Amino acid sequence: MAGGKRYDGFAPGRHLIDAYGGGGFRFGDMSHKGSILMLPSGVKAWAAIDGQPWSASQFQDVFSEAAGVELLLIGCGVDIRPLPEALRWRFRELRIGLDLMNTAAAARTYNILVAEGRKVGAALISVD
């Protein structure tokens, strides 16, 4: 993904997603190859890969910021994949709503909800 500053794994603050595809994302005059978490504290590199099984450890950063996230949009890559029931219960316990969709839809929805001032986070798997 061309243009902007190189992203080193964490960018503080709220950022809108300017572009996605080509295996990465562009936001806040930065670009990142790979998956990302968009959280109240900032944007973080995320080790999730399209098609790999979901695990609680992938969402530890989200759990740590639960007070600032009422809704988590999960961009599952190209195809939507369900979360295991135990993981869904963990989100319920923390009162974080979930919406799973493909990454393109999640990125667009995230931008709209951030612009509205909502307490939203996004976990976005990169797509080509």
Where are these regions (language model features)?
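A short glycine-rich beta-strand->turn/loop micro-motif centered on a GG-aromatic cluster
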Residues: 97-107
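Short active-site-adjacent helix-start/loop capping segments
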Residues: 45-47, 80-83, 109
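Mid-chain, well-packed structural core segment of small domains
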Residues: 62-99
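Short Gly/charged-rich anion-binding patches and loops
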Residues: 20, 86-88, 105-108
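Conserved phosphate-binding catalytic cores of ATP/NTP-utilizing and phosphoryl-transfer enzymes
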Residues: 109-115
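Short, charged beta->alpha transition segments
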Residues: 56-63, 109
